[in-house]
Amino acid sequence: MGSMRKMSSSFKRGSIKSSTSGSQKGQKAWIEKTFCKRECIFVIPSTKDPNRCCCGQLTNQHIPPLPSGAPSTTGEDTKQADTQSGKWSVSKHTQSYPTDSYGILEFQGGGYSNKAMYIRVSYDTKPDSLLHLMVKDWQLELPKLLISVHGGLQSFEMQPKLKQVFGKGLIKAAMTTGAWIFTGGVSTGVVSHVGDALKDHSSKSRGRLCAIGIAPWGMVENKEDLIGKDVTRVYQTMSNPLSKLSVLNNSHTHFILADNGTLGKYGAEVKLRRQLEKHISLQKINTRLGQGVPVVGLVVEGGPNVVSIVLEYLKEDPPVPVVVCDGSGRASDILSFAHKYCDEGGVINESLRDQLLVTIQKTFNYSKSQSYQLFAIIMECMKKKELVTVFRMGSEGQQDVEMAILTALLKGTNASAPDQLSLALAWNRVDIARSQIFVFGPHWPPLGSLAPPVDTKATEKEKKPPTATTKGRGKGKGKKKGKVKEEVEEETDPRKLELLNWVNALEQAMLDALVLDRVDFVKLLIENGVNMQHFLTIPRLEELYNTRLGPPNTLHLLVRDVKKSNLPPDYHISLIDIGLVLEYLMGGAYRCNYTRKSFRTLYNNLFGPKRPKALKLLGMEDDEPPAKGKKKKKKKKEEEIDIDVDDPAVSRFQYPFHELMVWAVLMKRQKMAVFLWQRGEECMAKALVACKLYKAMAHESSESELVDDISQDLDNNSKDFGQLAVELLDQSYKHDEQVAMKLLTYELKNWSNSTCLKLAVAAKHRDFIAHTCSQMLLTDMWMGRLRMRKNPGLKVIMGILIPPTILFLEFRTYDDFSYQTSKENEDGKEKEEENVDANADAGSRKGDEENEHKKQRSIPIGTKICEFYNAPIVKFWFYTISYLGYLLLFNYVILVRMDGWPSPQEWIVISYIVSLALEKIREILMSEPGKLSQKIKVWLQEYWNITDLVAISMFMVGAILRLQSQPYMGYGRVIYCVDIILWYIRVLDIFGVNKYLGPYVMMIGKMMIDMLYFVVIMLVVLMSFGVARQAILHPEEKPSWKLARNIFYMPYWMIYGEVFADQIDLYAMEINPPCGENLYDEEGKRLPPCIPGAWLTPALMACYLLVANILLVNLLIAVFNNTFFEVKSISNQVWKFQRYQLIMTFHDRPVLPPPMIILSHIYIIIMRLSGRCRKKREGDQEERDRGLKLFLSDEELKKLHEFEEQCVQEHFREKEDEQQSSSDERIRVTSERVENMSMRLEEINERENFMKTSLQTVDLRLSQLEELSGRMVSALENLAGIDRSDLIQARSRASSECEATYLLRQSSINSADGYSLYRYHFNGEELLFEEPALSTSPGTAFRKKTYSFRVKDEDAKSHLDQPSNLHHTPGPSPPATPGRSRLALEGPLSTELRPGSDPGISAGEFDPRADFKSTEAAPSLNAAGVTGTQLTVESTDSHPLRESKLVRYYPGDPNTYKTMKSRSFVYTEGRKLVRGLSNWSAEYSSIMDQAWNATEWRCQVQRITRSRSTDIPYIVSEAASQDELEDEHRGSLLDPQISRSALTVSDRPEKENLLSVKPHQTLGFPCLRSRSLHGRPRSAEPAPSKLDRAGHASSTSNLAVMSVVPEGQNTQQEKRSAETEC
């Protein structure tokens, strides 16, 4: 960290020095000063090329050394250079220069252009400088994981399925954890596969992963294009096939090019890369988590150097876990094999040890000593087997590479469970935490699985203040205050102490998950035993409010607005500040618990006296009425004494999910808020509170001119919570109507003693109020105890006007009420029971149908009258009738002549207004808020209250003036006349009770607001015309207030159609006098001069009327129309919402209307005074609200909460079922099932292929046994003395040199089921290397295999009886095409053979990695006058799981043969040429028919069908050989005098004489790569469309074609065969 500070300070100094380009130029100077390149300055000629230096560059490309001194060297390198002065070294022969290559790359040549940042640095650059560059200049965030990919440098093929799984897993691991990927950078080997995965990801998603390529500068193709300082360079990704250099991979985002002065050599990047990885691992993931950045190595394929890298990783301190991708080839497969069969200590049994040594030798073409060295390194790696994780595609427990990487990190680092949890939390991988950490579920983990040391925790516990964490530990076992000492004694138990540490780790993880907004982790931790009531304390909640992590929020701005002062950036937000913010956002009479006196006292005791001083500045020291003398002070002292700061329960919350949900809402964490809303009690109230808070925050953000998206997002969040509240209400209403109504009206002690209905009204949630449950509740409340179904208004009016009709109305009992408080219910029930008991003795009951009438009769007359007048509907009509009477009297007063003293009618009006004013004062004083100022503020938020205030104030002023003498009495009367307008407008409030008129009242209010904006626009147009017109027509006006009137007077009336035609043009009308300069009228009087510009007035007026009358007025109409339809669509909800306000208003009003309401006021005062006296005597609590509120006991409240939680669970269960039954979900599930089925089918196909291969192996072994038995029979015949000449024609057999020891059973690649293949393996002594190219070729070389057969000419002129061999003969003869070899059968025609001659068949096998030429063998014998002919069959040799290319047969020119009869020869690749079709069992093959007559022999190609097993050499049975001998013998007896040489052989042109073998369709893996631990991988080459099936090249026999032809003809035949296209 010190070096980081030095770099940052040097960077600052550079930026200060640059005065022209600021920080960019300073950063550029810092880069050039810090980073260097390396150049070779001494030429040491190479032994291979004298024109080239040992560094790889040409001698003329070197630059001279700096004159300042010798090149920079370091200690160890210098000593090495001195001791080995003859060798070239980086330290001695290179010099450092400031880097000249850094900037931005633009890749060209691909499908699309990517950009990447790059820099050329020296191989010994300090890693802290590189990290500073990456974080500060490249603007990269520190990773939470570092994946270092290692593998083969040369290009190799991966199985398509494995490549897909590898790419997806790597990308997913990097995406979900925010990882960096380190690779070699150049587009070869494993880097190309990583680049393909990155390319697929970047094409499917917008963001690019951070892939950093660390490549050697000397191996980069086109590196000259990169030279430049802070430049943007175009880079071509097309590589030169003749160059040894490699291009950079265009899928990477950053490149670090390590330079050690060499060219064309790897190794410069190894040390730099390892040091940089080590330095990054020392960095912390974030400030909250103490974990360093974890590093993991990913091995794909690779050579011996990869094994050394793995060992280096495992020996690091701390060790780096390694993930090996099995099935990718070479080093990865060897490591996987060793990991599978090694014991924990790195011990392997002898048989597997020998097999592994042979595998290493064959794979890397190593000698025995080299293979032993590499084997030792592998065994050293296996000593730390637990750090190596092998990914096998398809194996159980490993779905993808991503899980293997993250699991390896958790297990390999040997970290404790809390540290592993921190890593999983940093990666945001809840699946890893669930499967690897919480393996025991909610149960406690076993002893020893939790690793944090005890001592450090204990010391921290002693040093830390009494924070939430330490308090949490105290309550972890549920102890009380008096048992603290016992708790300390119990901590000596290691098990309990370990569990206590685990609890603390879980709580810390919960805090981190909340801060980092990890909803899934919060859910996981709650499921696994985190007690939220134990977890959440006051300090922790404050820490959550003050966090800077997570999504951005506007809480700081809200606190600043509430405190009305500028806050410092590091201001610590307290819970009391949060309480003020909540009260500000909720509005109305809402009172937060954080601002109550009890909480402030607790807060003061916990945190000292500093923060309450801030409360006094805010005026929050006391919200209750002033204290009464000494008693209040004593109570306050007692409260302070009772609070025990050391008790952990004091600083905790009763409902922690309430507090956390409010925190999530204020911090704008919607997903977290929704999750916390589901947990805990009072879900409906929480949803309504969140809806109100979000809506208020959206309003604040829109007024603060923040980004519109913020306000829109907050508004959407508000709608989401509002919808949740409605859905929950609907769910509970479906289950139980009565309990649902209780949910709406019960008292919410945690939410300012409010109710759900009040919270919905505060949030203006119309849909909630318009719900059926809410409306039923309001209807019950509106009707009181009256039971009226039809014409309730008419019945109520009749009851008011004719009181005796009240006795005929129906009333309800208290059992039918759904809104009354429990106290009122009990009182009413007691009264009814008393009445029933009193009337019970009067008579007996007659039947069930009379019960209702008896109940009605049981209600006394006084109760009926009282309940009638207390019903809100009766109060409404009573007040309405009274108000209409008042308006009639007011009309009469102002319409008739007003005397000096008020008339009786006027006194009634005055008394009405005065009593109404007293009622408004009563409303203010009896409202919910505590402070008088807050009461007035809340009261003024209602529009009609403002109207009443203005109207009453005007009337009072008018009444005072009216009582005075003239002229003040006249002024008072005028005020009366204006004031009655407001009282008429007040009638609109009465219309709100009507379903049809109510929405229109709201429309009028909205249209008035729209019209205010329109008036502003109209004012601009009106003034522009009015001022111009007035100035033109009246240029000589004197200053006067009439000017302002004249500006607006005429233009305003023109809007309504009054155009003042006589004043449009002053001189066009006859009524206006003429004017002119130096002109006189008829009487000789001088005319007045004309007003200049008067002709402009008509034109201006035309434009004005066009804009004002047509444009603006129609615009206003359109706005009104839009408002109308907007309100009309929600008219039902609007009316129901207004109905609530009306019902609540009349529910709380006294029974008598003004002016008789003064009697009700006197009654209320008397009851209040008597109630206070009774309280003093009995010590009762405060009087509870008389509103729509239900007071429940603790037991009833608990049952109600349980019902609400059940409804929440049922609601989400229904939503989940609905989502699963949706079409999109069904399509997704079907797609997953189809994909799983396809994978299963692929596995079945692989198993079937394995079974086929196994059957082939069995067939091969059987054929070998059969051949051995044939040899034994032959040996026995020789021993028995049977004549050898009789058996010459019988059979020719190919000998098999493959013994049983060469058949090794190996595990199939990428298979978890242990599939096996049996393959041929040959000793090294059997390999024939006759060319240097072949001897240096790694992998499987040509295998020598001898096949013996016999050729005999039955003619007396030529007779041959000797074996021939199948062997590879390299030479300069005409080449065969790659992938083919030629099989030549030659036979001498001379009866005199040279000693040691070996006529036979020449064949060449090929290796796909080695270039070679296989040619025909030269004729073995050439006698004078006699030449030999040859039958050439060209074929492709292959191994198991290889595709065969083409098989052709090239006969020579027509020859004369002498033969006996027709015979069919069957040839297939990998099988003998046999006669007959008796034992043939292949799938596809060809038949070469030879038709004989006296003069010619013709060849014909046909196709036959065979069943299976094309890859096993077919061995002729003894029975078939015997039949062949008999046919030969019978043929010779038919015409013994005719020799074969006398017959003519001619080609059949229509058949083209081709021997074609079709490809094998079902057997093997045609697209996969065949691998063996004992050989190099063999990749399947693309076969042409004409190419045929896969098969084995094995042996040939029974080829006997002899002729006597001229020598020239034979040469011509060879020429044609060589020129033929293969």
Swiss-Prot record:
Keywords: Cell membrane, Cell projection, Coiled coil, Endoplasmic reticulum, Glycoprotein, Ion channel, Ion transport, Ligand-gated ion channel, Membrane, Receptor, Sensory transduction, Transmembrane, Transmembrane helix, Transport, Vision. Residues 1-25, 64-95, 450-490, 618-641, 822-856, 1354-1383, 1389-1408, 1567-1622 are annotated as: Disordered. Its main location: membrane. One of its GO terms (molecular function) is monoatomic ion channel activity. Residues 897-942, 995-1006, 1121-1150 are extracellular. Residues 70-95 have a biased composition (Polar residues). The chain crosses the membrane at residues 876-896, 943-963, 974-994, 1007-1027, 1100-1120, 1151-1171. It is a multi-pass membrane protein. Expressed in the retina where it localizes on dendritic tips of ON bipolar cells. Specifically, it is expressed in retinal bipolar cells (BPCs) of the ON subtype. Not detected in brain, lung, liver, heart, kidney, spleen or small intestine. Also expressed at high levels in poorly metastatic variants of B16 melanoma and at much reduced levels in highly metastatic variants of B16 melanoma. Constitutively open nonselective divalent cation-conducting channels which mediate the influx of Ca(2+), Mg(2+), Mn(2+), Ba(2+), and Ni(2+) into the cytoplasm, leading to membrane depolarization. Impermeable to zinc ions. In addition, forms heteromultimeric ion channels with TRPM3 which are permeable for calcium and zinc ions. Plays an essential role for the depolarizing photoresponse of retinal ON bipolar cells. In the dark, tonic release of glutamate activates the G-protein coupled receptor for glutamate (GRM6), its activation induces the release of G(o) and the beta-gamma G protein dimer. Belongs to the transient receptor (TC 1.A.4) family. LTrpC subfamily. TRPM1 sub-subfamily. Disruption phenotype: In Trpm1-dficient mice neither rod bipolar cells nor cone ON bipolar cells show photoresponses. Inhibited by extracellular zinc ions. Inhibited by intracellular Mg(2+). Activated by the neuroactive steroid pregnenolone sulfate. Negatively regulated by activation of GRM6 receptors in the ON-bipolar cells. One of its GO terms (cellular component) is new growing cell tip. It is found in: Cell membrane; Endoplasmic reticulum membrane; Cell projection, Axon. InterPro entries: Ion_trans_dom, TRPM, TRPM_SLOG, TRPM_tetra, TRPM_tetra_sf. This is Transient receptor potential cation channel subfamily M member 1. It comes from the Eukaryota. Residues 823-832, 843-853, 1613-1622 have a biased composition (Basic and acidic residues). Residues 8-25 have a biased composition (Low complexity). Residues 472-483 have a biased composition (Basic residues). It catalyses: Ca(2+)(in) = Ca(2+)(out); Mg(2+)(in) = Mg(2+)(out); Mn(2+)(in) = Mn(2+)(out); Ni(2+)(in) = Ni(2+)(out). Homodimer. Interacts with TRPM3; the interaction results in the formation of a heteromultimeric cation channel complex that are functionally different from the homomeric channels. Interacts with GPR179. Associates with both guanine nucleotide-binding proteins G(o) and beta-gamma G protein dimer; implicated in directly regulating TRPM1 channel open-state. It comes from Mus musculus.
